[in-house]
Amino acid sequence: MTAPGPLVGWYVHHHGAGHLTRFRAVRPHLDADVVVFCSLPCPSSLPERTRWVVLPRDDDATTSPDGPRHPRDASPTVRGLLHWAPLHHRGHARRLAALASWIGESGPAAVVVDVSVEVALLVRLLGVPPVVVTQPGDRSDDPHRLAYDVAERIVAPWPRGLHGSPALDRVAERLRHVGGISRFADRAPVVREGVEGRTSVLVLPGSGSGGGARLAEDVALAAARTPDASWTLLGGGTGAWVDDPWAALSSADVVVTAAGQNSVADLAAAGARAVVVPEDRPFDEQRSTGRTLDAQRLAVVVDAWPAPDAWPALIARASALRPDWSLWQVDGAAARAADVVAEVASWQQR
């Protein structure tokens, strides 16, 4: 009789779609029963042996005798010790209580934390080994140091040597670089069927961006200045929506996107030529990635959405790129991340 797999918790941050997308890419490679904790609604379909627990929000305003109070005004950082632990916020309390209750009742072998300093600390205080997913940028602040200190393993979803980080150097013995994690890894590219002589340009907004009417207007202005290009906007609020953009991504001549970890890993999986527009994110996350892409000549990187007249030259530069996306080590990255989790979960059986 085959022994049952370990029980693993998985905390998925609710900002944007990147953390959820990463979970969905890694999950098929992990032989375990998994319980996901997240404030997002449960997806319409889940992998086998996976359960979803919807957590209360901890970022909405509360009502006090003095009127509405936002948690950012309730000492959420504890004088710089943590990132988010607002005082007297019932949602925050119920959120952590739900995790603690499940851990106490179920005794998981490990909990993946993607991402939250407070959840990583809670998990370790309850005697369960956390596997912390880290992100690029300047993570030298005290809360990140605390999260790294309590983590049994730290998963970096990018290749070793491409993102310098003194904050991670100090925990190198527990750090595992797995490469860029893409849901499209190992898929064959789709052959483009476009109009000869016209460059196909695909715009994929970052999963955490607002997009919307302003982006649609910017794309229309760019298209007007590039008559030899055909532009397509997917998502972003006003663009077309497809559940699986792989065909469009892998067949486009040039892709315009942000510098989030999923976006970049998807570019690598497609072998795309790209114009990358880093978005403002905490801890300089996307700008750090943009600098890496520029240094490795993997993409044309610009600081902000370009003026319409700049697009002809940018598309020409991107079209001329010969990016060596093998540097991003997408192949096998999701399985390597799952192996890190499985390693930590196996300790419970010792």
Regions found by a protein language model. Name each.
Residues 150-210:
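A nucleotide-sugar donor-handling region in carbohydrate enzymes
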Residues 27-28, 190-254, 264, 306:
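Donor-nucleotide binding loops and adjacent catalytic segments primarily
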Residues 10-24, 212-213:
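A short, glycine/small-residue-rich beta-strand->loop->alpha-helix junction that serves as a flexible
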Residues 110-115, 245-288:
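A donor-sugar binding/catalytic signature common to diverse glycosyltransferases
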